[in-house]
Amino acid sequence: MACRAIVFTDLDGTLLDSETYSFEAARPALKELKRRQVPVVLCTSKTRAETESVARKLGLKHPFIVENGGAIFIPPGYFTPEQLTSAGVRPKRRGNYVVLELGLPYQQLRRFLI
């Protein structure tokens, strides 16, 4: 079985310039990855809304990981229901996405920590 490439990248100071938040320097690499059909998965501490905005500007249509791994947002139709269930995944629907929530709700964490 051939190994297929996938790129996981942070945003701040990695894909985006740390001072200007520009991704112009990364644009040629992103274009080449798209040409080669290599998925680029954003992994960040940012929220869904922030990450979704960046993904849209970059033209990325792949899953993205937000809030330091708290959730994975998967575009509809990216994986079949069979692929998800065979992997033991029980996703929720949120807006246009299938979501895997990996963290605990804020109120539950707060009760535990305080």
Feature names for model-found ranges:
Residues 1-4, 59:
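Short, small/polar residue-rich loop motifs at catalytic or cofactor-binding pockets
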